[in-house]
Structures are given as C-alpha cells and as structure tokens.
C-alpha cells in the first residue's frame, strides 16, 4: 500500500522517480491522458525504502530490471491538482538498466496503463513539459534538494 495520507482534504504522498540515462538520453514517461512528461517511478509503500520502491516500480511497469546508483535529489513538492492540495516528498535516483536497451524504441507499460516510456535527448530537455517543473534542473545536474512551492 502506497504512503498516501489524507488530512483535512489535503494529501501527503511519498513518491520516487529515477533518471535512467544512456547515450545522453533520459527515459521519461507520458500518460496518454495528460500533456506532461515525468520521470518513471511511483509511490513508496509503507515499510519500503525509496530505493526498494523504484526498483519495484520499474519492474512492475516495464518488466525491466534496473541498478540504482544513488539518490540525487529530494523535492518537497507542494501543488494543487484537480482541486486537491498535495504535499509530496519525492526522491529522485540515478541508475541504469541491467540489460542493454535500445534508446530509439518506445517501452510499453505492461500493467495495461495508458503510459508509454521513451528516451529524450538531454540537450533537448527544455522542449518538453516535465512535472515537477524543477525536474529539468535535476536532469541537468543543477540541483539536489528543492522546495517546489506552486501553492501557498
């Protein structure tokens, strides 16, 4: 069960994402029902470390195995979505795929979700709408701990 707590109509989430980089390209995912891109990842379960969570999430969503190198950033992400205020703690890791992967192919979500994964050239990362918006700076190695306050 993911760490999601609702208090007074607001949500606390603990999430994890990973930068999987190969040939100066980073893997992003896009939900067919949304305009934005994100790093692949998901929710952290109760009594699960964030590192264990990212390994599990990538395996569940793509069937692929990854090796986690290090935690590169933590974002305190404060935002509103569909009228709900969120306080999200978001751990971002850097890692690699265990097996070789073709960066020119689209990876399908094996859980049946309307999500596709594809590699994006890091030099063209500014051409993409990525959430949280500070993710681009993390990909470009410019930040480590961020408070992303989109609401008051």
Predicted region positions:
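Acidic, metal-coordinating catalytic segment for phosphate/diphosphate chemistry
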Residues: 1-17
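Unchanged
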Residues: 44-67, 77-130
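Conserved Nudix-box catalytic region and its N-terminal flanking loop in Nudix hydrolases
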Residues: 22-60
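Nudix hydrolase/Nudix homology domain
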Residues: 32-37, 108-152
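Short, solvent-exposed loop/turn segments at secondary-structure junctions
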Residues: 5, 36-37, 75-79
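Residues embedded in well-ordered beta-strands
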Residues: 17-19, 25-26, 90-92
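Residues that recognize and position ribonucleotide moieties
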Residues: 12, 19, 37, 64, ...
């Amino acid at each position: 069960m993911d760490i999601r707590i609702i208090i007074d109509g607001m949500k606390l989430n603990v999430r994890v994402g990973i930068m999987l980089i190969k040939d100066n390209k980073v893997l992003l995912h896009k939900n067919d029902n949304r305009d934005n891109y994100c790093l692949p990842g998901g929710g952290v379960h109760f009594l699960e470390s964030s590192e264990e969570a990212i390994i599990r999430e990538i395996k569940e969503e793509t069937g692929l195995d990854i090796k986690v190198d290090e935690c590169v950033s933590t974002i305190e992400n404060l935002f509103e979505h569909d009228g709900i205020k969120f306080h999200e703690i978001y751990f971002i890791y850097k890692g690699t795929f265990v097996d070789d992967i073709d960066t020119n192919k689209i990876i399908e979500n094996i859980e049946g979700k309307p999500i596709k994964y594809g590699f994006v050239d890091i030099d063209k990362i500014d051409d993409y709408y990525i959430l949280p918006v500070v993710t681009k700076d993390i990909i470009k190695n410019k930040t480590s701990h961020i408070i992303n306050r989109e609401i008051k």
